[in-house]
Amino acid sequence: MTATIYTTADLQRFIDAHVIQAELLRDIGHTPTVPAAALALGVTPDQIVKTLLFLIEPPGQDAATPVVVISHGERCVDKGRLAVRFAVSKKRVTLAPAAVVLATLGYPAGGVPPFGHHTPLPVIVDASVQALGARHGGVIFAGGGDDCTMMRLTVAWSPLA
């Protein structure tokens, strides 16, 4: 299967089509990690969020279920909590390899944005991201479609009920 590879131009079209208040910051340097992104942007690492793809392997199924997790950049995602959420053992929760990330989401690992993916998937937003809304005026940065582009967003968290 050949992966559909999205570009920053594809992400900008998604942002425009969905009227998302986000700004792509292009050509800021090589930013595949949270520390590199923070350094390139001149911000603290606690302003960076990361978008990760996990594979959940339910017993008795031939294929793993991909799940997107958006987390505070300085935190490790607790695979044990994901396992509980999906009623599987912790060993059945793995971080997707780079080739699977590209084939599933359309963006390379290290530059995955929080939205606009090739394949619509369940998304889990870690509670740590909500807490970012109270700091730095709510301004956060996320992957911008490649490892030289970041996206500037503002966290606005409002319960629906």
Language-model features, listed with the residues they occupy:
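Extended, low-hydrophobicity, polar/charged segments
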Residues: 1-161
